[in-house]
């Protein structure tokens, strides 16, 4: 399709986005052709418009609403390392979940003993002016597994101002490894509020890379990891 992506478009193929959007996504590491990727997720404003969960037998990728319906135990991972009352942004995200009955965002899980070298790509895209986009993501690396994620976040070319609140909770089981690379390319009047926390068990390794490619109105970020096991290691770079 040559029409611009908006919040009501559901895509059969990630490559169906218009050329301008393709270029915007590529700037934040999201390849619409899905070359050398193990899964894909795209959220536009509050709507999940595309998910590809069929690219790897080692990794699960789905939107949070689907994941919560599939796995009863997933509730145990919600709002555990990021508290809903941590600040007004987490509170707004939690309230929106409660009022709508829908949890926006993505669920990614690497299966026990697997080592997927190709990254999952997830994109949070703001397509409407003055939107407050919220997302609540849960990432789980099961025991002795390895998982790589590229999270690319961007606004459409015609967007001047908006707010993005991304709550991400990550859990590394014993011997697991996650490399999490977040790339942001926002309009100048966008307010950015990532809220990231990680829980690590023994012998786990977490690597966090944050890249901001454009000026923004304001950004507040303080990613925090809890090393709850012997030889749990973490590295943060921005």
Regions found by a protein language model. Give the residues of each.
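Long, low-complexity, mixed-charge
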Residues: 1-101
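Conserved beta-strand/loop scaffold segments within soluble protein domains that form the structured core
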Residues: 77, 81-238
